[in-house]
C-alpha cells in the first residue's frame, strides 16, 4: 500500500489511510505494532478533523471575543480535550490576565477524578481552565 501511495494513488477511505499508516510502521516489532498503529491512526484522524473543522481558528476567535461577552466579575470555564487546545486557552488567559483584562485565571489545570474517568473514558484527556473578568 505504501508503494501505491508513493506512486500517486489517492487515499479515498479511512481504510486506505489506515493501511498507509500500517505500512509506515512495519519496522515496529509485531508485539508493539497493533498499539502503535492504533495511536498513530487516532492522532492522524484527530489532525485531519482539527484541520477540516478549522478548530484552532474557531477557538482562537472565540478566545479573542470572550472578554467582550463577559460582564465585570463574569466567569468563563473552558474544557479542552487535547494539548493543542489547552495551550491556546492557557496562553490566552495568561496574556489577558497580564494585560489586566482578567482579574484572575486558573494557575493549575483542573482534571477529572479517577471515578469520573472510570464512568466516562472520554473524560480522561479533559482539562478545565477558568478566568474571571
Residue ranges and their predicted role:
Residues 1-133:
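S-adenosyl-L-methionine-dependent methyltransferase catalytic core, i.e., the SAM/SAH-binding region
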